[in-house]
Swiss-Prot record:
EC class of the enzyme, as a word: transferase
Originating organism: Clostridium botulinum (strain 657 / Type Ba4)
Source species, domain of life: Bacteria
Gene that produces this protein: rsmA
Lineage, highest ranks first: Bacteria, Bacillati, Bacillota, Clostridia, Eubacteriales
Positions of transmembrane segments: none
Identification of the protein by name: Ribosomal RNA small subunit methyltransferase A
Catalytic activity: adenosine(1518)/adenosine(1519) in 16S rRNA + 4 S-adenosyl-L-methionine = N(6)-dimethyladenosine(1518)/N(6)-dimethyladenosine(1519) in 16S rRNA + 4 S-adenosyl-L-homocysteine + 4 H(+)
Family assignment from sequence similarity: Belongs to the class I-like SAM-binding methyltransferase superfamily. rRNA adenine N(6)-methyltransferase family. RsmA subfamily.
Pfam families recorded: RrnaAD
Length: 275
């Protein structure tokens, strides 16, 4: 059965508070599966399985699938619809409260697939990356504007701290755009399926990741300010900061949105050296 048929079969009522929008376009499901490149060696962690339409396809292709679902009304539906699969584990929990490192212990070739309410997208991505979770890739449906921020380049308005965070840890690839007409109920925004492939090493080597991300966040907190003014929040004396900019070869009058990840790395290392 397709998504609409399962929803009607169980007379499922959508929970607006959970931001539920279920994918009904089968071509999008196929593109997610193809883009995620799932095979029989993979353990898949699915966040937000809905009524299990995509989950079935994952179960057919993967070694095992762990699906995380918050809505208690969906649990019996998923249990019934997927009862024939012995490689399926259903976790009834808020994904924001999951210990992903524990869940991933002793598992090889972990790939994540997610179709999340958009309000939790950035927190989930940030946690998976900053907590050093051991996964190969994350294929996720997200709001178009967030995908554009993740996939942005310097010198554009979408480029910001989220861009740097994701691209520090991952290669990014947009798989396809998704119209609101592909969902029930119909959301008010366009969506994009994007894949994040985890790098074996961060894109740049830095002396302190904590300082690196502090510099990045400070540089974007007030986008129209120069780096010199933005980085005053680090509370470093004027002479030391002048020295750091000079050693990094970066003009302090530039704005954060003009710096590449490599330049952020160079600047943070030079600041680290003078602390």
């Amino acid at each position: 059965m397709n998504t609409k048929e399962i929803v009607n079969k169980y007379e499922f009522k959508f929970n607006k508070n959970l931001g539920q929008n279920f994918l009904i376009d089968e071509s999008v499901l196929e593109d997610i599966i193809e883009g995620a490149e799932i095979n029989k060696e993979d353990t898949v962690i699915e966040i937000g399985p809905g009524v299990g339409t995509l989950t079935k396809e994952l179960l057919e292709r993967a070694k095992e699938v762990y699906s995380i679902e918050l809505d208690g009304d969906l649990i019996p539906i998923l249990q019934e619809e997927l009862k024939e699969y012995n490689n399926f584990t259903l976790i009834h929990k808020d994904a924001l409260k999951i210990d992903f490192n524990r869940l991933m212990e002793n598992k090889d070739s972990i790939k994540l697939v997610a179709n999340l309410p958009y309000y939790v997208t950035t927190p989930i991505i940030s946690r998976l990356l900053t907590e050093k979770c051991d996964f190969k890739s994350l294929t996720i449906m997200i709001q178009k504007e967030v995908a554009e921020r993740i996939n942005a380049e310097p010198n554009c308005k979408e480029y910001g701290s989220l861009t740097v965070l994701v691209q520090y840890y991952c290669d990014t690839k947009i798989i396809r755009k998704v119209s609101p007409n592909c969902f029930i109920p119909r959301p008010k925004v366009d969506s994009i399926v994007i894949k994040l492939d985890r790098l074996s090493e961060p894109r740049v080597r830095v002396k302190s990741e904590k300082l690196f991300f502090n510099v990045v966040r400070s540089s974007f907190n007030m986008r129209r300010k120069t780096l010199w003014n933005s980085l005053k929040s680090l509370n470093i004396n004027k002479e030391s900061m002048e020295n750091a900019f000079e050693r990094a070869g970066i003009d302090s009058k530039r704005r954060g949105e003009t710096l590449s990840i490599e330049e952020f790395g160079k600047l943070s290392d030079c600041i680290y050296d003078i602390l």
